[in-house]
């Protein structure tokens, strides 16, 4: 290579595989209903691009904005359009979860009465706290940044079912009840089997699960148990 003319730009194509699933899920038609005054095509392209990036090369929205030209077949969007996706996702959350639940109910052997539950934290490159953004115990050891806590329920196939967000200073044990109740509402279930790690093991949670006649498999440290146990 002796000059810039000797270098040929290459493009990324991985998002083409994701687009196949996107079309099978009929997500384009779903999000078009939430366009409002926005251009439906622009909205759908913005959401798909950010989703594809999250799957193939997770980055900040600003980084995604700067790197759009690398993706074959993608129509570049404005930074405002990409940030606007967050409002649409927040607005459509409950409808989207139910929409996807119906799809996976038909396409997979989902056992609605069984759910695996875990909690994680998502930090922000900021120290400004707000309604959900709070300082708390960070699982990624970013204790100098605000964060939110997310409780995630997945099915027997490892596919997410639903999630709930909590203020960043929420303890793991305090998230289980709301998430399980959401699962019951989503599938109109009377009884659920919850599988979780020891971080969710508390007297309050076990008492709740027993009082609602739910089954559960939750880790327990034998060293902390009584001799009778």
What annotation goes with each model-predicted range?
Residues 131-134, 209-211:
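Short, solvent-exposed amphipathic alpha-helical segments in soluble enzyme
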Residues 172-229:
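An internal, acidic/charged active-site-proximal segment
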Residues 148-150:
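Short loop/turn microsegments at loop-to-beta-strand junctions
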Residues 1-132, 143-144, 153-164, 169, ...:
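Dynamic "connector" segments at or just before major functional cores
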């Amino acid at each position: 290579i002796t000059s810039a003319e000797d270098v040929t730009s290459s493009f990324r194509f991985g998002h083409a595989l994701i687009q196949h699933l996107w079309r099978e899920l009929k997500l384009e038609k779903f999000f078009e209903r939430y366009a409002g005054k926005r251009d439906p095509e622009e909205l759908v392209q913005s959401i798909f691009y950010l989703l594809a990036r999250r799957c193939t090369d997770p980055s900040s929205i600003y980084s995604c904005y700067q790197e759009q030209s690398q993706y074959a077949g993608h129509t570049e969007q404005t930074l405002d359009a990409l940030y606007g996706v967050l409002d649409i996702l927040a607005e459509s959350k409950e409808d989207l979860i139910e929409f996807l639940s119906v799809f996976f109910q038909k396409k997979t052997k989902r056992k609605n009465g069984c759910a695996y539950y875990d909690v994680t934290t998502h930090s922000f490159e900021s120290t400004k706290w707000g309604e959900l953004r709070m300082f708390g115990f960070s699982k990624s050891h970013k204790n100098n940044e605000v964060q939110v806590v997310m409780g995630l329920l997945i099915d027997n196939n490892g596919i997410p079912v639903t999630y709930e967000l909590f203020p960043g200073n929420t303890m793991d044990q305090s998230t289980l009840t709301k998430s399980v109740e959401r699962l019951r509402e989503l599938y109109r279930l009377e009884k659920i089997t919850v599988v979780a790690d020891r971080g969710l093991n508390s007297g309050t949670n076990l008492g709740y699960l027993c009082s609602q006649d739910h089954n559960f498999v939750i880790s327990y440290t034998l060293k902390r148990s009584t001799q009778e146990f």
